[in-house]
Amino acid sequence: MQFHLKSILLYLTVVLLPISCTSKKSDKEQNQYDWNTGSVVIVADSNLSYVLEQLIPIYENFYPAAEVSFKYTSEDIAISDFKNKRNTIIAIEKSLTADEIAVAAHNQDAKILENTFAYDAIAVIANKSFKDSVFVVENTVSYLTTATAAKLVFDNSKSGIARAIMQLSKTDPSVFKNAYSLNSVSDVLKYVSNNANAIGFIPYNLLSNRNEKEAQAIRANFKFLSVSYRDTITAISQESIAQQQYPLVRPISIYIGNCPDLAGQGFTNFLFKQQISKALLLSGLVPKNIPAREVNVTDEFNPEKTK
């Protein structure tokens, strides 16, 4: 009887041990491939810093085992490095072309995942004493080639904003070199503030949140020009961006290549959640997925209104 009992125990040990090991291995594999653990550094367009930084604590509050940070640079550098696998995940305000995606996919040796989660825009600003109230996209060349007093001012020579205006207006790069290129958006604000004939181009996200002091200051101290494109004049607002009526709308996207940091995919997935969409709406921007019963976009841009 004792021998029989020992035989049974030995049998159970032999049978159950592999099952136990398999279970432990599965748990380990599950943790290893948990998208919401670990850390990731995402290379991003510096003009997106205000948008992106406010999203980190929301995500990390839900997933405390994950850590997200951003390394900011110009849009041109971020894209160039992504195409050449010097980085593997980027956040930019641009839709990559089919050729850009193909080059990146080849060099990254991976399928490129495009994730557009929100929309921003380019705001056109001027000094309070500037006489005109409309910026005509098709007249960009005349601003750069004639003796007009107006000067176009951008944040830097590798700015995505400058490239967007150049491409939409179909201005030759050799002519566009006549535009003023400074070092940052802050420099653009200073220059326009001190020069009555300057026209500046800045991210809408800097002034979209009426509850932020910096946004309030920008709204109060600058003139905002409506934009004319193809004979249609549109003022910038959350609503005109949401309805894609404003001609200078820019998609905010994260592109993922051969990125080994799974938290990058976890964070990107979270950007489509209701919590992020609500935060973007409250900051005056437009999420790609607007939460049901939460549609409350501003139908008119009033720089003087701060609340």
Tell what function each PLM region has:
Residues 65-80:
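Central regulatory/effector-binding core of bacterial HTH transcription factors
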Residues 1-19:
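Sec-dependent bacterial lipoprotein signal peptides
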Residues 76-107:
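Pocket-flanking alpha-helical
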Residues 73, 91-100, 183, 201-204, ...:
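Short beta-strand and adjacent tight-turn residues that come in two discontinuous sequence segments
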Residues 3-4, 21-63, 83, 112-120, ...:
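Exported/periplasmic ABC-transporter solute-binding proteins
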Residues 43, 69, 88-91:
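Short, conserved beta-strand segments within well-ordered enzyme catalytic domains
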